[in-house]
Structures are given as C-alpha cells and as structure tokens.
From Swiss-Prot:
Pfam family, one: TPR_3
Gene3D superfamilies per record: Tetratricopeptide repeat domain (1.25.40.10)
Organism: Yersinia pseudotuberculosis serotype I (strain IP32953)
Record protein name field: Low calcium response locus protein H
Keywords of this entry: Chaperone, Plasmid
Record-annotated disulphide pairs: none
Length: 168
C-alpha cells in the first residue's frame, strides 16, 4: 500500500512537471498537430453551421488536449456565447486573453457578453482594451468599426440613463 501511494505521488509530480514545462495532454497521448487541426476544422465548421452544442464539445476537448492554443478558447467562448452562457464565455475569453495578450477579439467578445448581462461599465472597459489592441492593424478594420459603434452606443445609453435620473 505504501508503494502505491509513493508511485501515485511520483506520477503526479512527474505529470505536474511535464505540464508546467510546456507539455500538453495531446503530447502525452501522441495526438499529432494535424489531428488537432482536423478537430479544429470540424469544430469551426459545426459552429459556422449553427451546431453550437456539437462545436462546444469539440472545442472543449481541444482546450483540454492543448491548453496553450488560444484559438481553441476563442472557439469555446464563441460557442458558449451563442448558447447564451455568457459567464462561461467570459471565462473562456479571459483564459484565451491570458494566452494571447495581443488578440483584440478576446476583450471584444467578452464585452459583447457583458453587454448582454447589462454590465455597461465592464463592457466599455473591454471595448477600450480591444480598441487599443486593434490600433492601426488593417486586418482588424471591420472589428475596429464594430468596436467604435458599440462604444458610441454605450455612450448614448449612459447619457440617456443619466438624463432619466436627472429628469424623472
């Protein structure tokens, strides 16, 4: 019994060391990057087809298999957002933002979720961050336009709420 406990502890320490050293579950199971890409394509296509629950399952598995690929968390967050699971989507986007701090889509989509929850100040903060990350990146021109529109809408909503308080 003592030997089993020692073996289990050694295994846990080895696993922890492997993961902390940049290892992934996919590496442990010898799942190739090609296989991960095929799974990503499957999940992406399911999402694009409106099969959010199916895509969610695949993105969730991908996040477990390779917790370093921020695309997987963007996809997971998008599925959760599409299914109305805003808090879970925000968690996915937050984790992805930690993985890729220069990716403006994470704070943007988190802001969309926050708006759905009626949390204007928090959403505005996320949009400002997205706007800052976009800064003169032509590949995000469309996103930049959306961010600007949403910031303007929040500003107008705040002004209207302020007027209602001042003039009941």
């Amino acid at each position: 019994m003592q030997q089993e406990t020692t073996d289990t502890q050694e295994y846990q320490l080895a696993m922890e060391s492997f993961l902390k050293g940049g290892g992934t579950i996919a590496m442990l199971n010898e799942i190739s990057s090609d296989t991960l890409e095929q799974l990503y394509s499957l999940a992406f296509n399911q999402y694009q087809s409106g099969k959010y629950e199916d895509a969610h399952k695949v993105f969730q598995a991908l996040c477990v298999l390779d917790h370093y690929d921020s695309r997987f968390f963007l996809g997971l967050g998008a599925c959760r957002q599409a299914m109305g699971q805003y808090d879970l989507a925000i968690h996915s986007y937050s984790y992805g933002a930690i993985m890729d701090i220069k990716e403006p889509r994470f704070p943007f989509h988190a802001a969309e979720c926050l708006l759905q929850k009626g949390e204007l100040a928090e959403a505005e903060s996320g949009l400002f961050l997205a706007q800052e990350l976009i800064a003169d990146k032509p590949e995000f021109k469309e996103l930049s336009t959306r961010v600007s529109s949403m910031l303007e809408a929040i500003k107008l909503k705040k002004e209207m709420e302020h007027e209602c308080v001042d003039n009941p």
